[in-house]
Amino acid sequence: MKRTIIMMLDSFGVGASADAASFGDVGSDTFGHIAKACAEGKADIGREGPLKLPNLARLGLGHAAMESTGAFAPGFGDNVELIGAYGHAQELSSGKDTPSGHWEMAGVPVLFEWGYFSEHQNSFPKELTDKILARAGLDGFLGNCHASGTTILEELGEEHMRSGKPIFYTSADSVFQIACHEETFGLDNLYRLCEITREELAPYNIGRVIARPFNGTGQSDFARTGNRKDYSLEPPAKTVLDKLKAAGGEVVSVGKIADIYAYCGITKKVKANGLEDLFDATLAEVKSAGDNTIVFTNFVDFDSHYGHRRDVAGYAKGLEYFDARLPEMLALLGEDDLLILTADHGCDPTWQGTDHTREYVPVLAYGAGLKAGSLGRRNSFADIGQSIASHFKLEPMAYGESFI
């Protein structure tokens, strides 16, 4: 029975990529800087001491990062019995965003330029927002800027509740984000507003509209809920997910995967929020998955809760939790199953600002007859998609080189 399980650690980069200078990210290193902070006792909130990831180390994480950066991260070295194949991959796509990374790892790199709202203030064209407001029956909006999602709630959340005006904001990514209170504005109203915005953005080539619902009574207790929803464009070509579905296979999305691919190639969507819930749901789907199935999970907390918020200790604690549960996954795998652990970009929690970082991503592969050892530097995330196509004996993808 052949299956593929993809555990996507959102934002878990392993060192600045060769083209990082074009993004202002030379020197960034999500994994390495977390390990360094832990070793120096600078990440002892909710955990303590050096970064402890013994299971990821056995799968080759430390070695993949060493090949990426030229040195082992603090606390990692050769004194480990490797059980997996490991490498690191360069992104071919033009951006360091979520859709680009996900589509490329499924065999479809983004070779065009996304549209962006580059102005930090008055970010959105008036012509665009006027159309959105008119269709939605709203008399105004708040924000209109680049912002951290948590900071903008502190600044504008109470005014939003008083006025009923949605909060529009963006970032360095190709994204239009809308934050609204679940109770005072209404979740369905937020989703409808996002659908309108997605339609009006057609001429702008923006990758995603993101619904950012929150709750709470005031500035001190505002918090995002688990009802985030991404409205993505469709990938520009058929991904390996589409190809497996067309061949009669199953593709199970856990978390926000379905949204990122605009539901293309997805046969089942499982909603889950938080590391524990996402891991539980992944295990449950693997237990019930039949032949010719992909189970694909995005562990978004690493990015949204820790990377963007520049929370080094939180990121480290999350990684250690994930690592401690990996034996549960390994115990479920048959001899023909393929497990892949990777990331879609970096988001170094020690870096300036709050945006993603252009980094190599780890490619850790286990099972399906793969020998433990180095896969080297992969020239594209698409090598993952090509390898999955090879594993299922599908028609080859247009991009990528299989490591199987």
UniProtKB/Swiss-Prot annotation:
Cross-referenced InterPro entries: Alkaline_phosphatase_core_sf, DeoB, Metalloenzyme, Phosphopentomutase_DeoB_cap_sf
Transmembrane segments: none
Binding-site residues for Mn(2+) 1, renumbered to this chain: 10, 344-345
Pfam families hit by this protein: Metalloenzyme (PF01676)
Top-level taxon of the source organism: Bacteria
GO MF entries: magnesium ion binding; manganese ion binding; phosphopentomutase activity
Chief localisation class: cytoplasm
Enzyme class: isomerase
Swiss-Prot/TrEMBL GO biological process terms: 2-deoxyribose 1-phosphate catabolic process; 5-phosphoribose 1-diphosphate biosynthetic process; metabolic compound salvage; nucleotide metabolic process
Keywords (A to Z) from UniProt: Cytoplasm, Isomerase, Manganese, Metal-binding
Reaction it catalyzes: 2-deoxy-alpha-D-ribose 1-phosphate = 2-deoxy-D-ribose 5-phosphate; alpha-D-ribose 1-phosphate = D-ribose 5-phosphate
PANTHER family listed in its UniProt record: PHOSPHOPENTOMUTASE
Primary role: Isomerase that catalyzes the conversion of deoxy-ribose 1-phosphate (dRib-1-P) and ribose 1-phosphate (Rib-1-P) to deoxy-ribose 5-phosphate (dRib-5-P) and ribose 5-phosphate (Rib-5-P), respectively.
Name listed for the protein in its UniProt record: Phosphopentomutase
Organism of provenance: Shewanella putrefaciens (strain CN-32 / ATCC BAA-453)
Taxonomic placement: Bacteria, Pseudomonadati, Pseudomonadota, Gammaproteobacteria, Alteromonadales
Gene this chain is encoded by: deoB
